[in-house]
Amino acid sequence: MSAEVETSEGVDEPEEKNFGENHIRMADLSELLKEGTKEAHDRAENTKFVKDFLKGNIKKEIFKLATTALYFTYSALEEEMDRNKDHPAFAPLYFPMELHRKEALTKDMEYFFGENWEEQVQCSEAAQKYVERIHYIGQNEPELLVAHAYTRYMGDLSGGQVLKKVAQRALKLPSTGEGTQFYLFENVDNAQQFKQFYRARMNALDLNLKTKERIVEEANKAFEYNMQIFSELDQAGSAPASETVEDRIPVHDGKGDVRKCPYYAAGQVNGALEGSSCPFRAAMAVLRKPSLQLVLAAAVALAAGLLAWYYM
């Protein structure tokens, strides 16, 4: 009976098997991410910062502050990864020994700023928005955390190595790794093999198609946060000489737990922190007046993350 049905439908067993395998491959999360973020890649491809960084057009002070932006980003990301290390939608991707960057970034911060570096650094508002988004996802929609982990770490294992060499050459940093510990993955012997292993783990996550589509959407959102940094930089660069960047761009002070801020708590209700700035941040901007280099730093740091995708 079953043989007659297969014949009448015109589909034999080998063809049906091939169709099933092709369908599974097309539904793999890694493939969906690759295709679903292609437009974002194309838009980022022409970013001036990407081209300048590859040419080695970066000053040491900007690179120092770019490291600061990375520190805040990875501190948030790894805090949420630790929080969700047992969550079924993320546990298979939890590799703190191999991937976590906070400790390495701490060494870089000490190299650039000295032992009291924590007293000297803060995060621009545009970069802080991404940090807040990561915290929101980790606490409320952990199934989407893979979008941020995959975007960052897979890029770091790829193009990050190119950026390390560019930075060492352009800034005359020690070849022994001081100032570029962020790019050194001591517990990953073969980056290409590890990336393949990570993608396989990601594809094996028990997720329905709707959740996978949401993950792709979240990855694109991460790119948009990067673009907001570039937009902020454009506005700062076009500000009249009489108008300081600090007057145009409020910042968060980067200390304490931002999630205790009443404005942040209210934003959590809506699922995102967008729109007007926190009044506290605006006040802090007036009182503390961070330098233009801080804004540039955050832009370079996130541009580096975008560039890393092109070498995956």
Swiss-Prot record:
Keyword Phosphoprotein: yes
Modified sites of kind S-nitrosocysteine: C261, C278
GO molecular function: heme binding; heme oxygenase (decyclizing) activity; metal ion binding
HRM repeats (start-end): 260-265, 277-282
InterPro entries linked: Haem_Oase (IPR002051), Haem_Oase-like (IPR016053), Haem_Oase-like_multi-hlx (IPR016084), Haem_oxygenase_CS (IPR018207)
Catalytic activity: heme b + 3 reduced [NADPH--hemoprotein reductase] + 3 O2 = biliverdin IXalpha + CO + Fe(2+) + 3 oxidized [NADPH--hemoprotein reductase] + 3 H2O + H(+)
Modified residues (N-acetylserine): S2
Alphabetized Pfam families for the sequence: Heme_oxygenase (PF01126)
Domain of life: Eukaryota
Record PTM text: S-nitrosylated by BLVRB.
Chain positions recorded as heme b binding sites: H41
E.C. number(s) listed in UniProt: 1.14.14.18
UniProt entry keywords in alphabetical sequence: Acetylation, Endoplasmic reticulum, Heme, Iron, Metal-binding, Microsome, Oxidoreductase, Phosphoprotein, Repeat, S-nitrosylation
GO annotation terms (biological process): heme catabolic process; heme oxidation; response to oxidative stress
UniProt modified residues of type Phosphoserine: S2
Family: Belongs to the heme oxygenase family.
Purpose of the protein: Heme oxygenase cleaves the heme ring at the alpha methene bridge to form biliverdin. Biliverdin is subsequently converted to bilirubin by biliverdin reductase. Under physiological conditions, the activity of heme oxygenase is highest in the spleen, where senescent erythrocytes are sequestrated and destroyed. Heme oxygenase 2 could be implicated in the production of carbon monoxide in brain where it could act as a neurotransmitter.
Descriptive protein name: Heme oxygenase 2
